[in-house]
């Protein structure tokens, strides 16, 4: 985490009009989590490609995060982006919603990033404890298995990549 913060913080904070964007889709059961994550990653790439072809280069970073609802035993994969420019963030959200008609518009968010946002983004990709403070090993196993080979963090546009940092989940 410290390597990620040190590697990206200055570059991200130098971006003009940095926006924090949350993009979600409906929660799923554990058996459906790998497919949901794969679909979300595919749609994210499609949206970025479409916007680039229209002349909008999204510059920033994407984070894939998964939370577990212990009461319902469902999983909620979602993205957090730090993107330069409110107009770009809005275009990202609009294109995401076009491709995710079952997503609740109220679950999506755009807000101006502040000094804490970069640090918060790099904290974790899954919450390791429930509200009770107990770790659910089965839920964590489901999340980790679904995340094998997936990038938790992905730079967008011409954001400079950090050297010597691997954030992929390995077998």
Predicted segment positions?
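Right-hand nucleic-acid polymerase module
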Residues: 1-75, 85-171
């Amino acid at each position: 985490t410290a390597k990620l913060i040190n590697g990206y913080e200055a570059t991200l904070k130098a971006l003009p009009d940095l926006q924090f964007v949350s993009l979600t889709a409906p929660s799923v059961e554990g058996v459906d989590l790998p497919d949901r994550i794969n679909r979300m990653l595919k749609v994210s790439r499609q949206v970025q490609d479409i916007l680039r072809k229209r002349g909008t280069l999204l510059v920033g970073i994407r984070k894939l995060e998964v939370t577990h609802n212990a009461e319902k035993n469902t999983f909620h994969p979602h993205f957090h982006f730090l993107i330069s420019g409110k107009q770009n963030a809005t275009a990202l959200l609009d294109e995401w919603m076009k491709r995710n008609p079952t997503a609740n518009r109220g679950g999506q968010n755009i807000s101006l990033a502040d000094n804490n946002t970069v640090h918060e983004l790099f904290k974790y990709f899954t919450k390791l404890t429930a509200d009770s403070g107990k770790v659910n090993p089965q839920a964590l196993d489901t999340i980790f298995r679904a995340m094998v080979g997936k990038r938790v963090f992905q730079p967008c546009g011409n954001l400079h990549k950090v050297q010597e940092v691997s954030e992929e989940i390995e077998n």
